[in-house]
């Protein structure tokens, strides 16, 4: 979510032609200064906000926000930024495991199914943004189709992004420790 916030701020700063690293860090520092609880993950943050009623604003992944809204329709409002980051959970067949368990064919079929239109619709029903454009358009009432979605490639890939933002002494440490 840190990358998403920087991405959003970068777009704002680009409009003013004042997109310096210091300005981005300043923005994030001000934001984090208002954080009353910093949970270790998305589910914990959602639980803290929605069920324990701690905090004024929850910055969450889209699926978490949609799930919360479905569970508490009259209590919350989703405010969607104009820019966010496309989060794509990794899936893989682990060769050693499927060989030992003799499940190679089943695992491969499951992996292939995940990208089918049927599976994309099931995922969309649970708040996960479909990657299939046709299916995404079927859910235009649920997902904001105008949002600009950056990818990790826009930030130099995972190795580069991790080094800059999350390594010891990176942006997160610098902002969090100040």
Annotate each language-model stretch with its function.
Residues 13-81:
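Ligand-binding pocket segment of bilobal, Venus flytrap-like solute-binding proteins
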